[in-house]
Amino acid sequence: MPPSPAVVGRSLVNSFKQFVSKDLHTRHVDATYRLVLDCVAAVDPLMRLYTFGSTVVYGVHEKGSDVDFVVLNKTDVEDGKGGDAATQVAKGLQADILAKLARVIRQKHLSWNVEEVRRTRVPVVRVKGGGAVDFDITAYRRNGVRNSALLRAYFEQNPPCRWLSMSIKRWSKQTGLNASVIGGSITSYGFNLMVVYYLLQRNHLQFVPPSTIDVSRVEPLPPHLPLEEPADEGLELGTQVLDFLHFFLHEFDSDKQVISLNRPGITTKEELDWTKSAEDFARMNGEKVHYQWCIEDPYELNLNVGRNVTPLKRDFLRRHLEKARDTALLTIV
């Protein structure tokens, strides 16, 4: 017998005591942003620096968490609804500008540890010891800015729903489901899409067309969004958590349906041609793509954010969803 919503809520609120006692204001990010912006200007004064990721989505920053930055040129910003090029040429241009930026950062901040990572899907510069905040920098990619702005637009509609998202994100890392953990398969971004999709299906949020998000109208460093403690000793949070788990265990049909914010209502695998035959065809072309747990990216065409979920990992996910129901996302032993 699963615990009641009240018990789940109290347990989760208790588990976040240390988190809410911290200074979660984004002012810590502001200082680092200005230092990095100074380095960007030294490379190219016309370049813009944007923040994306959880700091933008939630409007808070926990000390010790990494921050994501991206450098964009004037054309990227003016064409704020344009798609990101995924060619090898584009990847090379990203790596080149990041190499220049990495050199400037090393010159201006001798104590910072700067690592250039080229052999990834997206080239990135990773910086540790960046003042109070560690950060990653990518280049010429608007999708991260648009994704984060879209998710923030949803959470601004109903700010307390951030607690559901943060609870699911933390649980996903504890269970090893999160791609940030070795063996994990769904990114924090993917779990955020799952949370917002669930909230839309329950009419807790109003649909936001992804096409309305324009980088030219997004603030490079969005302001802090105060985070109030869950009301009613977490009763609403406990209710949402149990219903989220029930939804993905018993209502969402992973064999036929796609988690999608691209359009209202239900999206099917058949509509997107995310079928077993498409999976087999991709494998014949050397691509490791799975359509077992489908999460459609709002901006990157034909991208399944859940592409790393194999049949085995889908079963693993379901077992953890069942266990989460009985343990209040592992907060009740």
From Swiss-Prot:
Domain of life: Eukaryota
Site keyed Important for catalytic activity: positions: D136
Domain PAP-associated: 237-302
Its EC number(s): 2.7.7.52
Activity regulation details: The 3' uridylated RNA substrate is involved in the selective incorporation of UTP; UTP binding is favored due to the constraint posed on the positioning of the NTP base by the continuous stacking interactions between Tyr-189 side chain, the bound NTP, and the terminal nucleoside base of the RNA substrate.
Result of altering R121F: Loss of catalytic activity
Cofactor binding description: Binds 1 Mg(2+) or Mn(2+) per subunit. The type of divalent cation used by the enzyme affects the nucleotide specificity; Mg(2+) induces predominantly uridine (U) incorporation while Mn(2+) also induces substantial incorporation of both adenine (A) and cytosine (C).
Protein's recorded name: Terminal uridylyltransferase 4
Organism: Trypanosoma brucei brucei (strain 927/4 GUTat10.1)
Protein's gene: TUT4
